[in-house]
Amino acid sequence: MPESRMPPRKLHIKSYGCQMNVYDAQRMADTLAVEGYVETTSAEDADLVILNTCHIREKASEKVYSELGRLRAAKDQAARDGRGMNIVVAGCVAQAEGEEIIRRAPMVDVVVGPQSYHHLPQLLARAKTCGRALETEFPVADKFGFLPQPSRQAIRSRGISAFVTVQEGCDKFCTFCVVPYTRGAEASRPVAKVVEDVRRLADNGVREITLIGQNVNAYHGEGPDGRPWPFGKLLYRLAGIPGIVRLRYSTSHPRDVEDTLIDAHRDLDALMPFVHLPVQSGSDRILAAMNRRHTADDYRRVIDRFRQARPDIAFSSDFIVGFPGETEEDFAATLALVGQIGYAAAYSFKYSPRPGTPAADMQETVSTADMDQRLVQLQNLIDSQQSAFNRTALGRTIDVLFDRAGRKPGQIVGRTAYLQPAHVEASDAIIGQVLPVTVASLERYSLFGTLASKPTSGEPSNHAATGGAQFQTTAGA
């Protein structure tokens, strides 16, 4: 008789927050693929559901508990159907609230922090034996040394853009931020390991790499010479890997912008002229209260250094309004800084106190009404700058890396150097190619145009055109 085979078990991962979580979700899927799990888009049909969580803002945490309430019903239904469902809470909420999650959501089987994903198979086995498993320590061993490499099929299914973690953790201890407590101290991967990952991705059709870390430009991984390499030197090394046509990185800290990074933007065509450089506030008084350890003028000087090296460079940033003690004068300084820099995009949020951070104990709170008013005012200014920046593309011919099929039949979508979505009518054979597009119109934040030259023959993409890495802020900088 032929040997019977167990059907594959179904895995559903829902990620919240930054692109580090997107990368972590992929590595968890790779780890569990070895155990016979295949991904599904339906949580209700899954044998294993993982919530990969974010702890940056209060609402993000509460969303997790709301989702767990929904999953409890799905788990009960699975039991009535005669099958099991395991629920895992991973990520930064797991790290920060481990025991509290078990108390509030007893249907959870495993709680695992972001440094222990490689232990998922063992934790699931422990939960089966003991009822549940929790692991939120910061292990001494490097988790990356234990995570399996993604299969060729997995790489190709994820698109022509990919994230690669090169640095994790944060030593800055901004007073509003939980990242040092949930991700641990700054640690950098060795140059050789990063190069190995990028080569493997390039060999399987990836064309664009986004290097990620909580403070990515604090990178100091060991080079082949046995010495720590600065981030800029790593970029020079990766730019020489065949097949990689675009390099990006996020998130940066103004204090860690060193000369080799500036030089890389001057010298490397593959390094995109778009930098996410969070500043959080334009007020020196508030920056000091945040423990940012730089002034608004320090930030302006960093921007000037980038622009001198690469005149076509553009910037995005993060801002917090309503930080404890923020006055109208402090907020006016933020508006002034935004007006002086001129951003292509930015992310702005109302201050959200996080338990365990120094700012959560500060007494000079700002009213909700004032925070709401300031957020609207700041976002209106940022939106006007982004619209003005996008209008500069009208009538111009710009390079676009095409990465997926559009929503409309016959439409292909790519991204410019500045991450603007660009839509053209074309065959999906152009996916994976960088082609010039003449921009004819704008719609909200997207560009629409026509190909200015014929696609390269014989270079169709082998990817399922499901989209690749997209820009979000990585918490920590």
Swiss-Prot record:
Residues 391-453 form the TRAM domain. GO terms for cellular component: cytosol. [4Fe-4S] cluster 1 binds at C18, C54, C92. HAMAP family: tRNA_metthiotr_MiaB. Binds 2 [4Fe-4S] clusters. One cluster is coordinated with 3 cysteines and an exchangeable S-adenosyl-L-methionine. CDD domains: Radical_SAM. Monomer. Its EC number is 2.8.4.3. Keywords: 4Fe-4S, Cytoplasm, Iron, Iron-sulfur, Metal-binding, S-adenosyl-L-methionine, Transferase, tRNA processing. SMART domains: Elp3 (SM00729). SUPFAM superfamilies: Radical SAM enzymes. Pfam families: Radical_SAM, TRAM, UPF0004. Residues 454-477 are annotated as: Disordered. Catalyzes the methylthiolation of N6-(dimethylallyl)adenosine (i(6)A), leading to the formation of 2-methylthio-N6-(dimethylallyl)adenosine (ms(2)i(6)A) at position 37 in tRNAs that read codons beginning with uridine. Its cofactor is [4Fe-4S] cluster. [4Fe-4S] cluster 2 binds at C170, C174, C177. This is tRNA-2-methylthio-N(6)-dimethylallyladenosine synthase. Residues 464-477 have a biased composition (Low complexity). Residues 9-129 form the MTTase N-terminal domain. It is found in: Cytoplasm. Belongs to the methylthiotransferase family. MiaB subfamily. It comes from the Bacteria. The gene is miaB. InterPro entries: Elp3/MiaA/NifB-like_rSAM (IPR006638), Methylthiotransferase (IPR005839), Methylthiotransferase_CS (IPR020612), Methylthiotransferase_N (IPR013848), Methylthiotransferase_N_sf (IPR038135), MiaB_methiolase (IPR006463), rSAM (IPR007197), rSAM_horseshoe (IPR023404).
